[in-house]
Amino acid sequence: MYQTLTITSAQGPLSYDPSPGTFMHSAASSPVYVPTSRVGSMLTSISYLQGTGASQGAHSVNSHWSQATSESSSFNNSSPHTSSRYHYPPSPPMHNGSTRDTGYSSSLTVSSRDQYTPLARSLNGSYGSHYTPYMAPQLTSAWPAGPFDNTMLHSLQSRGAPISVRGAPGDVLDELPESRECVNCGSVQTPLWRRDGTGHFLCNACGLYSKMNGLSRPLIKPQKRVPSSRRIGLACANCHTSTTTLWRRNTEGEPVCNACGLYMKLHGVPRPLAMKKEGIQTRKRKPKTLNKSKSSSSNGNSSHQISMTPTSTTSSTNSDDCIKNGSPSQNTTPVVASSLMSTQQTESTSPNSNTLKYTGQDGLYSAVSLSSASEVAASVRQDSWCALALA
């Protein structure tokens, strides 16, 4: 993926211009080389630095460079041949720096095993191996190879725009719900994910609590109150039982069960241990609805048992009731008796006469009947204690 300075065995043509015009001085005095205007010409091939006396050959130049199959074919010192691009023989190599030239050539010469390394590639941008590369779509060349190919151009060519493999971190979290975590309680599993005001994830419980109360949900659950009948370590000071419906305290402040506390309250002495029972005895209370129905039925029966026949006992009781309720004097009793007798006689003599009854007082005044309106007015005037009858 990244270019190195490793050069494959397929070497390019000679990278210098051996014409006499390129030297600053004459060739006999000092052979100082002046580089040409090409950028990567010095990096493509420095094969003339070999320490041998024979001149180095150059490969033929095509539109692209082909990789050599063996090292011996590309570096053949015994058979010099000229380049097809330049029509003049190459300059002889320098003999005065053989030791230094050998060090340079050893670092830049590629062995036969280096041509199959994954980082080595030819100048045309393709790999030497005949296997199909799996990263080929990302390393495709941006422009086709030309006759001016070199290492510098290919190093710039391979640096294209990186291919985005995955999106932003927020999108990845949305696609992977198991990676979410509640910022309040730390839960990773919830039937519904919610968000707080800042956009952080909350579980369903914390989100609802925050929405309803406006506060963060408390992390510590409140301890449930232990029932009084099952409090750990609590026992009756008298019978030593630990099960009761109600805990009480004796005069000394010690906890006692309901039975011992009631016994001490009623009798003033501690409850004897012989009365202790394993189970809790409760009373069988009758429902209150049955008691109400019975009382209403008894009241109805008593009201229907009142006799409607006019007798002296009823008249006397009625007169007694009137006297107790606030009669002005005791002289009204014979007046009431005489009026009742006169009404009974008129009923027996004239049965077809008009009768007047007071509604709502049939039980008390069922025998009172007057024949005319004048008698009604006279009776009302005489009986001052019956002023409520006009209401």
Swiss-Prot record:
GO molecular function: DNA-binding transcription factor activity, RNA polymerase II-specific; RNA polymerase II cis-regulatory region sequence-specific DNA binding; zinc ion binding
Compartments it resides in: Nucleus
Signal peptide interval: none
Extent of Low complexity compositional bias: 66-83, 292-319
Matching Pfam families: GATA, GATA-N
Tissue and organ distribution: In embryos, expressed in the presumptive heart mesoderm. In adults, expressed at high levels in heart, small intestine, and stomach and at lower levels in lung, pancreas and colon.
Amino acid composition bias (Polar residues), ranges on this chain: 96-111, 326-355
PANTHER family xref list: TRANSCRIPTION FACTOR GATA FAMILY MEMBER, TRANSCRIPTION FACTOR GATA-6
UniProt function note: Transcriptional activator that binds 5'-GATA-3'-containing motifs within gene promoters. Regulates cardiac-specific transcription during embryogenesis and thereby cardiogenesis.
Name assigned to this protein: GATA-binding factor 6-A
Organism: Xenopus laevis (African clawed frog)
